[in-house]
Amino acid sequence: MRLASFERKGRPGFGIVVGDGVVDMAARFAGKANSLREVLASFGLKELERLAGSAPDFGVDEIAFAPVIPDAAKLLCVGINYMPHIKEMGRERPERPVLFVRFGDSIVGHGQPLLAPRESEQFDYEGELAVVIGKRARRVSRERALDYVAGYSCFNDGSVRDYQRHSPQFTPGKNFHASGAFGPWLVTTDEIPDPRKLQLTTRLNGAVMQHESVGELCFDVPQLIAYCSTFAQLEPGDVIVTGTPGGVGAGRKPPVWMKPGDVVEVEISGIGTLGNPVAAG
């Protein structure tokens, strides 16, 4: 299944994308769940699977995509998790996952503009795989970790590099308003049993900037879930963003920065393409 959050006629909604149509889950869960996160928490994927065969209620062209989980309680992001990216940033391979958080209003949905901040010219792209948790997870083993996943999506961890360097923590450079993107939808695990086989590609104005197998992660998806669940109680709808491969703008000579008028795309095999124009912020 492809599960999406969106706005239609000025109202928030969520549903199942089937071809060029959308099965309206907001209407079917009215009074019982107000978001995809609430459906995952209260009903799980089985109820969505039961409704997946319903006829579409409207077309994809009638919606404006929102972030897949716009109300995620936890948005945990992983830094320096592919060796080529570690090298281009002049870092050493970490002994444990490097984690930081993003705020909900720092991300937008597919097709929505990323805002290049007026405070900096160093606005960089980072194509990444996002993991959406499907059920409560605490102190889970690496061997069982994938049992707790609802599905996967594309993520652009847009980064303002000079602000990222303002402190040892990445928070300022990772949380400018509308600087990152998440979407277009979540693809459930029955369609992606092994995320290591996915291929990730980032394009800027049509030019390939990043291309890597998710199987090259230093800390893979099960390791990340197991590690995060040691200190956090992961809940349905929580998101772990797994890190970016080499090829970021900051690592190029000369550096390449996103600017208003650009279009950036993150494509992951088996999921789809997250595309966003860049506008002045």
Annotated model-derived regions:
Residues 1-97, 265:
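N-terminal non-catalytic cap/leader segment that marks the start of a structured domain
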Residues 9, 46-49, 56, 62, ...:
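Catalytic-pocket segment enriched in acidic/His residues
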Residues 93-110, 125, 259-270:
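Structural signature of FAD isoalloxazine-binding scaffolds in flavoprotein oxidoreductases
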Residues 4, 65-67, 87-90, 114-123, ...:
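A generic local secondary-structure boundary/capping motif
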Residues 20-21, 105, 207, 271:
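Well-ordered beta-strand scaffold positions
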Residues 5-7, 102-104, 125-129, 133-135, ...:
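Short, structured patches in soluble enzyme cores that scaffold and shape functional sites
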